[in-house]
Structures are given as C-alpha cells and as structure tokens.
Curated annotation (Swiss-Prot):
It comes from Thermococcus kodakarensis (strain ATCC BAA-918 / JCM 12380 / KOD1) (Pyrococcus kodakaraensis (strain KOD1)). Heterotetramer of two alpha and two beta chains arranged as a dimer of alpha/beta heterodimers. The uncleaved protein forms homodimers. Optimum pH is 7.0. This is Plant-type L-asparaginase. InterPro entries: Ntn_hydrolases_N (IPR029055), Peptidase_T2 (IPR000246). Gene3D superfamilies: (Glycosyl)asparaginase.
Length: 306
C-alpha cells in the first residue's frame, strides 16, 4: 500500500491567522509527493514533497530559511533510502534553492554521505545548481527584531546555551520540513531546514545527521522536527525505526519516540512523522503544533492539520 506523509515543523504557531496557510502548504506538498508516488517512486515522491515545502516561504527551509547570528543562511538537508541504506546529506549550505536535491545528488553521485559548507556549495555548482538567495524580507525583519531584543538585554555579549535562549525567546525555534513515503517496495525519508534563528555560525542540527533527524531502513522511515540537539542525542529517527522492528506500527512507534524525547528532555521539544513498510503512517509531537498532511491508497483527499 502506497503512503506518504509530510510535516511543516513542530512548535507553536503564534499567529492564528497563519494556521490555514500552513495547513494549505503541507497539503500542497503531500499532493506534489503523491503525484510522484503514483508513478511508482518513493524517492521521487519525497524529493518533490520536500521541494514544495522548501519553495514555500512560510516554512523554514529553502526559501524563507531563518538567519544565523551574523545574518546569513546556512541550510541542512538529508535523504535516505530504506532498501539499500543509501543516504546523502548537506549541512551549512547556502546559495541554493533546494538543498534536498543537492542531498540526493550527494547520495547518487558520490561515495560520501555528508558534505558541509563551502564543499557542499562547490559540489552543487559543479552539478549545475544555480546561485539563489533564499532570504526573504519577512525573515530579515524577524532577524532584525530578535537581534534588537538581544542587544537591548546585553545577551549578545554573553551568549546563552540554545535551550536557555529558546525558553526566553521562543520565537528563535522555527520549523523544519520533511517527508516519508512507501511505494510498495521501499521506504524513503527526507528532511530539510534552515535551522534555528540566531544560531551560531557553523551550528548543525539533527536534519542532516543520519539516524538523528532522518532515517529509513527496510521496515520504516522517519523525519524529525524540533530541537535538533535532542534528536541527535537520542538518535531519535533511528530509535523510531527500531521500535517498528520490535513489532510496533508507525503510529505507535511515533508516540514511543516522542515519549522518549519527553522523558529525557521535557515537553515542547520534538515532533516526528513516520511510514512503515506496511503502508501505515504515524505522527506525534510534544509541542502545541506540528503541521502535517498524509495520503494513502484508498484516500480521495489528503488529511491535513496542526
């Protein structure tokens, strides 16, 4: 049974008027992926779904990615095939429109798994990815407002740990996007993000860490969202797939993974989406919101919500 699920990030959507736009964004993305999935390829479906999310400036990935402490964009992305365990990822990449597509090329064109920074950019240029500026006016304005808050309180001189910063300034935690699909033969997972607002230059979250924020094997795939350091420490995407290997379905495994995150790091930290090799979808969160949408064989329209 073919199935695909996408997410637009876990956290709190502070402006209620944004919720319909977010739901429409994940709905459009899952439909883009579903069209590819019906042609038979989970890999193409995941890439297309994530590209649709990257191209929508309401989400924190690709166009509309958040800015680092020094006002730049450093994006992360990863994709993984469950049947072969092939994987590709980029971290701290800039100047490209769709990091997920560069990550796929790392998987298909090299013997490596992860390329970072300038090396990832050079690789993208060699393969014909054009120069692109993903910074939007809205993100630049948000960055300036946050910087002003921090400067007024003197926070920039004595930089806080990320979890302390998020507690005091929750607006720095922005969404990640991801997709997981099953085409009847293989599960594929992909994730993309601009990271955390005002992150230290060079900071890498869970998204490009295979097993941390992105993972797929022969039984299941997962894409995580939230505070990346939590997912890395728990190897959360891999842990979720392991729960399926132990006999859980995708929904039960998703809930177990989030329970694990809450146990060790508290609420308001993580969200996850999954698909297992039986075509079951799963999603769970310990945050107020996590936008999602999914389609399966037998459904006429996607289910979407926050």
């Amino acid at each position: 049974m073919a199935a695909i699920i996408v997410h637009g990030g876990a956290g709190t959507i502070r402006k209620e008027e944004r919720i319909p736009k977010v739901i429409e964004g994940v709905r459009e993305a899952v439909l883009a992926g579903w069209r590819e999935l019906k042609r038979g390829s989970a890999l193409d479906a995941v890439e297309e779904a994530v590209k649709a999310l990257e191209d929508n400036p309401i989400f924190n990935a690709g166009t509309g990615s958040v800015l680092t402490l020094d006002g730049k964009v450093e994006m992360d992305a990863a994709i993984m095939r469950g049947k072969t365990l092939d994987a590709g990822a980029v971290a701290g990449i800039w100047g490209v429109k769709n990091p997920i597509s560069v990550a796929r090329k790392v998987m298909e064109k090299t013997d490596h798994v992860l390329l970072i920074g300038e090396g990832a950019v050079k690789f993208a240029r060699l393969l014909g990815f054009e120069e692109y500026d993903p910074i939007t006016e809205e993100r630049l304005k948000q960055w300036e407002e946050l910087r002003k808050k921090l400067i007024e309180k003197g926070e920039t001189k004595h930089w806080k740990k990320l979890n302390e910063l998020i507690k005091e300034y929750p607006e720095v935690l922005r969404s990640t996007v991801g997709a997981v699909a099953f085409d009847g033969e293989e599960v594929v997972a992909g994730t993309s993000t601009g990271g955390v607002f005002l992150k230290m230059f060079g900071r890498v979250g869970d998204t490009p860490i295979i097993g941390g924020g992105t993972y797929a094997n022969e039984v299941a795939g997962a894409s995580c969202t939230g505070l990346g350091e939590v997912a890395i420490k728990l190897a959360l995407a891999k842990s979720a797939a392991d729960f399926v290997r132990l006999g859980m379905d995708a929904q039960t495994a998703s809930e177990a993974a989030i329970s694990l995150a809450t146990k060790y790091f508290g609420p308001d930290t993580m969200g996850i989406i999954m698909v297992d090799a039986k075509g079951n979808v799963g999603f769970a969160k310990n945050t107020k919101h996590m936008s999602y949408a999914f389609m399966k064989d037998g459904m006429d329209e996607p289910e979407a919500g926050v």
